[in-house]
């Protein structure tokens, strides 16, 4: 890979996979888009156009760089993009610069530092780890450090984590550049409350699978899902 990270190839498969998801230039845009998405770190307002321009003008090289951005960086990025596209607004030509959008982005990035372990795990974009698996991993291990040092055998003890997924998770955390990116994120202030490991689902619906269909009158689908999972159910 162009990032220099290790590659992995499943037995019997032709395609190889780069393990440098957090730092690989070829995957950078998608990694940042996923990291900032609503169900991940929820950085409101950081859309694809801004992400493309931040990358094009070398403001970000990895997801950790998002937390180094200041108001002036966003304003300079916007000005350079307008000059590139030949679309400088008349108000800007007259010396009037709108800054509220940039203020809101800086505030959204700052607010995203206070998150949960399950959201953070999902935001990392680990291969095959969706929201449900991220939540299961967070509850099973309780701590990111414990999870990062878990063996493939220990990972397969987690509900719904098979050998292939365990190998992907282990390879992701074994890649030094991914670990460096995670360390940089934590140093930037990204944090969450860790908890005691919960090896088995608890609650009156533990061990049951619930399928949500149709429309709900008083809850959003996400709210209903969160409540059911809090009662121990697995929501399909």
Predicted feature locations:
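Compact, charge-rich alpha-helical regulatory domains located at protein termini
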Residues: 44, 48-85, 92-93, 153-157
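Conserved structured core elements
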Residues: 26, 44-48, 57-60, 68, ...
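DNA strand-break repair and replication-stress modules
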Residues: 35, 77-236
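Flexible loop/turn segments at secondary-structure boundaries
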Residues: 25-27, 62, 218-219
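Short loop/turn and capping residues at structural boundaries
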Residues: 11, 65-66, 132, 196
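Short acidic (Asp/Glu) and glycine-rich catalytic loops that position anionic groups and cofactors
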Residues: 11-15, 29-33, 48-49, 148-149, ...
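Cys/His-rich short segments
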Residues: 1-44
């Amino acid at each position: 890979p162009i990032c220099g990270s290790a590659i992995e190839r499943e037995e019997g498969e032709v395609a190889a996979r780069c393990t440098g998801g957090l730092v690989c230039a070829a995957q950078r845009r998608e990694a940042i888009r996923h990291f900032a998405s609503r169900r991940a770190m929820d950085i409101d307002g950081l859309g694809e156009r801004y992400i493309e321009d931040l990358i094009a003008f070398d403001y970000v090289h990895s997801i950790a760089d998002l937390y180094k951005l200041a108001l002036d960086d966003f304003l300079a990025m916007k000005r350079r993009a307008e000059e590139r596209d030949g679309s400088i607004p008349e108000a800007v030509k007259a010396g009037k610069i709108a800054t509220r959008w940039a203020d809101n982005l800086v505030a959204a990035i700052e607010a995203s530092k206070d998150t949960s372990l399950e959201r953070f795990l999902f935001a990392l974009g680990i291969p095959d780890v969706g929201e449900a698996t991220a939540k299961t991993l967070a509850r099973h291990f309780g701590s990111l450090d414990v999870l990062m040092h878990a063996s493939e055998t220990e990972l397969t003890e987690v509900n719904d984590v098979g050998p292939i997924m365990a190998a992907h998770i282990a390879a992701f955390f074994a890649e030094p550049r991914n670990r460096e990116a995670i360390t940089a994120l934590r140093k930037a202030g990204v944090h969450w409350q860790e908890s005691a490991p919960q090896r088995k689902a608890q609650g009156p619906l533990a061990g049951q699978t619930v399928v949500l269909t149709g429309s709900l009158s008083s809850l959003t689908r996400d709210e209903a899902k969160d409540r059911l999972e809090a009662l121990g159910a697995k929501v399909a």
